[in-house]
Amino acid sequence: KAVPKDSIYVATEDNRIADHCKKHNIQFIMTSDECLTGTDRICEVSKLVEADYYINIQGDEPLFNPVDIQSLIQELSKQKNLYDVYCGYCSIDSEDTFYSLNMPKVIFNKRKELIYMSRAPIPSNKNNKFKKGYRQVCGYAFSKKSLEIFDIKSKTYFESIEDIELLRFLELGVKVKMVEMSKKSIPVDVREDIKKVLFALDNVK
């Protein structure tokens, strides 16, 4: 809904997903099974498909809102190549989400540039009470240049500790612009999250 069909590719190493794409006439690219992260997969795609920017919607965000893809595109147009990496975020409404180690939290400056991203509850206070926070939404835009930088380096120090690939960009000095998105997307990090997605889909119907 957000972009022309011929601009969309499914990047996968799984033949089952490839077969599904064939059945529904969806473009796909087979990537290697050596990709450690989704961004590694996009790096492989960037070597096969020429573009200035690559928008990546992770497969574990099945309810991603097409309007949020438009938000990324609008931000790219507005910033006019000022940033090489863009990442979605939204506010956190529940204490459970704030303290969940499965959910990366983000802090950023007044220019909406990412300062840090962590599985820990940030920002925190002396009383360890939830007050306000923001979480990552797994919608990204990468310039070809940023993917080349990402691709030539192995996992960086904080990236390895947190297991959050976007930290590699920060550690390599690449600015990350945060883009506000809706709260509708439900990331699937653990098996229990599948139930949440199915429940949400049933409610839509």
Give the ranges of each region predicted by the language model.
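Conserved acidic residues
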Residues: 6, 52, 84
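Short phosphate-binding loop-to-helix
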Residues: 9, 15-74
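Conserved core of the sugar-phosphate nucleotidyltransferase
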Residues: 65-154
